[in-house]
Amino acid sequence: MAEPVQEELSALAAIFCGPHEWEVLSRSETDGTVFRIHTKAEGFMDADIPLESVFHLPVNYPSCLPGISINSEQLTRAQCVTVKEKLLEQAESLLSEPMVHELVLWIQQNLRHILNQPETGSGYEKCTFSTSTTVDDGLWITLLHLDHMRAKTKYVKTVEKWASDLRLTGRLMFMGKIILILLQGDRNNLKEYLILQKTSKVDVDSSGKKCKEKMISVLFETKVQTEHKRFLAFEVKEYSALDELQKEFETAGLKKLFSEFVLALVK
């Protein structure tokens, strides 16, 4: 980890030193650092709104944008997504310098103005899928592999909700013991999905206690190519045979992806 980033993390830990204000969720030489900050910001009618901000600092941060996830019991998911998008816009002006504290201060000062903007809304009306099949320069595709799902019904509903809230399309695919999640959408939203997947208590352990997902791997990530199918919705599908799963990938223009990454899971 670069020294400026270490210094920034130490400073953040000193600033957010109150009970439960600061928590490091993971550190990795390859994936960077993920941490959570709990703060409050002024919302409607001057009322304080509690905010949970999860930041992912990749190894090449601050030369690249951090991953950001925003949650609040007093905001809708659509509002949280809008707040996150505004933060990322602000982050672009701070590239190449430590920015997390600046971003936290900015959202504390500007949350009320963001929520008052008509396009922010007060419900989930923005969380809809585009039916366009034209090439979108901002469209990316990610393939994830899960080791298992113990609380399958709850887990599936959670994945469906995240995909809907973040306007992601694709497939949650089951074949025997193989579990794959194929996601298409805005790259920043894909990053936020991964943060949610890794930091939320989405499953249960062997004793039935709620736990975070620790056995997920990113098999593939790339910008959507011309030959790739545009998924119009997020669907959960089960396959009884490998050739059925293969056909799904081939229909989506992902034959090479299947051969390189999925077949290896079967062997």
From Swiss-Prot:
Biological processes per GO annotation: negative regulation of NF-kappaB transcription factor activity; positive regulation of hypoxia-inducible factor-1alpha signaling pathway; positive regulation of protein sumoylation
Taxonomic superkingdom: Eukaryota
Occurrences of domain RWD (ranges): 7-114
Any one Pfam family match given in the protein's UniProt record, by short name: RWD
Cellular compartments annotated: Nucleus; Cytoplasm
Coiled-coil region: none
Gene3D superfamilies: Ubiquitin Conjugating Enzyme
This protein's GO CC annotations: cytoplasm; nucleus
Keywords carried by this UniProt record: Cytoplasm, Nucleus
Subunit structure: Interacts with UBE2I/UBC9, NFKBIA, HIF1A and NCOA2.
Its biological purpose: Enhancer of SUMO conjugation. Via its interaction with UBE2I/UBC9, increases SUMO conjugation to proteins by promoting the: binding of E1 and E2 enzymes, thioester linkage between SUMO and UBE2I/UBC9 and transfer of SUMO to specific target proteins which include HIF1A, PIAS, NFKBIA, NR3C1 and TOP1. Positively regulates the NF-kappa-B signaling pathway by enhancing the sumoylation of NF-kappa-B inhibitor alpha (NFKBIA), promoting its stabilization which consequently leads to an increased inhibition of NF-kappa-B transcriptional activity.
Domain-level remarks: The RWD domain is required for the sumoylation enhancement activity.
Protein name in UniProt: RWD domain-containing protein 3
Gene: RWDD3
